[in-house]
Amino acid sequence: MPQADGQHSEIGGGKPAAAPRPSNVPLTTAAARGGSATVAAGGLDAAYNYGPTVMIDGGRTRMWWCSQYGSAPPPGDDILYAEAPTLDGPFTGPGGGVPRAVLSGSGDGHFDGRHTCDPSVIRVGATYYLYYTGAAEDHAFGNSIGVATSPDGLTWTRANGGRPIVEPAHDVHRDNVYGAGQPSAVYLDGWFYLMFTDTTGRATTPNGAGQFVLRSRDPVFGGGVESLGKHGFEAVPATNSPRTSSVIEAFSADLMWVEALDAFVIADETKTGTRISFFDRSFTTHPYQPIVVGGPWQEGPGLARRPDGHAPLSAVDPCGQVPFDVVRATVIGAATAPTDLRHYGLDVKGVNACPDPARTLAVLDGLAAPSPTRTMDLLTGGKLIRVDRRSVAVALSGQVLDQRPPQFDKLPVAATIASAGPAVQAKDRGVAFVLDGKLWPVDSPAAPVLNGSVAQTISPAQWDAYPTGSSLVR
């Protein structure tokens, strides 16, 4: 299917911020890295590789991208999956070997019958969500956006009854007949944010460039949808309502929330590399000046993100610097389509992300690190939890550091997850650790197993009678 920029033949409500807000502040960058080698490529007969989405998930780096396998019917774009210990790869299929095709066209009669491409993957609780571009054939305005769900990021089930969740608005028809696609998703404060291309949007440029943002508390955007307009987010009746405001002039961009900077970032490609642009929560102001991750490119970047689409923390100084890493296609291959996925990155330094206790708790939320007693400490929901087993801390955290941040030393330990400690489960309630007589719900079924805990089955009434601690839901 055609790419949004027309260059190649294949497709490639939050809480208010504290005042005063920074405005166009220059950032200091250092530690430019990457680009020395191709880190991922499809095996078999894959002739192109581009449009990655990159997730730092526990102790591994996971990546999904657009390619094509002849062995994955029907003929057309497929979404591949591979993983590696770090961003520098090499990325392989689960257990080694070639990357796996995990989502392909659904066949005749469906909006994504032939092509699935441009993945954006996030995890909320125990569910992975894959937002993607789908097309039935290579025809004008044929691209729309779908979503699939998975318990593991490997086996996917199409949501919304297999129907698209975002279709072209058809506000205006230009020479660029791509339609709607190239989604990027983030989960923040209970909202699913979805940024995407729509070449039929009213606010696009003459060549169809532009990025639009919707948000909803429903992952399939079936209701309660808000669209980013000129004055912030406003309720709209449908996901194809007129596109009145584009947040940036770009194709194939990626979105991320950076808690350390209290800002959204959008990554898109410019002449010198990947431009990182900064926006406040309402996308109405620019708190910081753009930075550029330099180097060659041929298609849009995939930012390295945590499972919820947030920026990873620095392993060296989580309150003082922020890593920005991308994977992007760098050459046009034999199939005249982008390939050679390589990693590039840099750090923003001199950040004052933890000026007070409240900001410290927000920035470091979801982080696990070694404790002074040879166990692990997990910061979640404003509470520091001591965890006997590292594997359990990994399962419950958004990110694990090998070096303990000094800010942890100022926090009291609220509870301890002891090895083989008590856990309970109840119908329609889930699973929880019992810590000091209180329920601490978890969304990782593996966590009690990894802890050696046998979850006792109780009734919903018994569950509801327990006093509650904080949620350990990621």
PLM features: residue spans?
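Glycine-centered flexibility motif
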Residues: 35, 146, 179-181, 302, ...
